Amino acid sequence: MSETSSKHFGSIRDDYAFFLQHSTEAEADLRAYAPHLHGLAMEDESYRMLDFGCGDGGFTAKFLVQSQWLPERLWLVIVEPDATYRRQAVDRLQAFTPHPVQAWPALPPHLKACFELILANHVLYYAHDLKGTLSGILHALATPGLFLAAMAGRTNALAQFSRQCFDILGKPFPFMTAEDVEMALASLGEDYGAEKVHYELIFPDAEEHRLSMGRFLMGSDFDAVPRRAILAGFEPYSNAGEIAMQVVHKHFIVRRHMPWQGRHSAASPPRPRQH
């Protein structure tokens, strides 16, 4: 993720908050990530974590609560291009470690084997150079190490809504999808796993709520889409005074293995640094 990601959240923070409030996406992601974390960090080791595209740190905080890692063992770095979100994330996440949380607007180039865990939760949609971004992330992944990412695919109900709106505008769909991640990982020669994650989006059916969700999905292109098209896009999901959508996306898992002797000890945990 760079400072010029293809979607800017400054004008849609309230709409994004509305989505988070009315969806079970975060809970579903946390449940699905949990089994992959077993054995990642042992009690006498340090663990260096990068959250790539952390937003305001809300999901990261839930992730760290679930992990139950010892604070003194955690070294945390976040990448977030939005300055407001970045400040909020540092304030929220500092409570999870006595070590200063490092915050970057973009991933520095040429990082190598800096992190035992890298999380990219629903952020790779906005990467201008997806293959280059993934290459940089995976170069930063240590051995042993774990990379976890969440991405919606082309059949995702929200992605289909957005695609229909861009079709109306005569514009190509500007965001990456799970299918693009699969192709990028394959072209990089990465051995990865993938699994489906299901969640619900349910909110009271009111015009203002349909418009809010449309604004979240379309970002700066929202005003160009006819209002009636935004409203009509949610009509198939309207029932008994609610909009109810069953949504599915994918998790991608890259795991690096090596013998115990290759792990860093907790006595002198190396801080991520730029090379």
Task: Describe each model-derived feature in a short phrase.
Residues 1-41:
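Class I SAM-dependent methyltransferase Rossmann-like catalytic core
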Residues 50-108:
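Class I SAM-dependent methyltransferase SAM/SAH-binding core
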Residues 116-130:
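A short SAM/SAH-binding and catalytic strip from SAM-dependent methyltransferases
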Residues 173-189:
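Short alpha-helix
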Residues 191-275:
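Conserved Class I S-adenosyl-L-methionine
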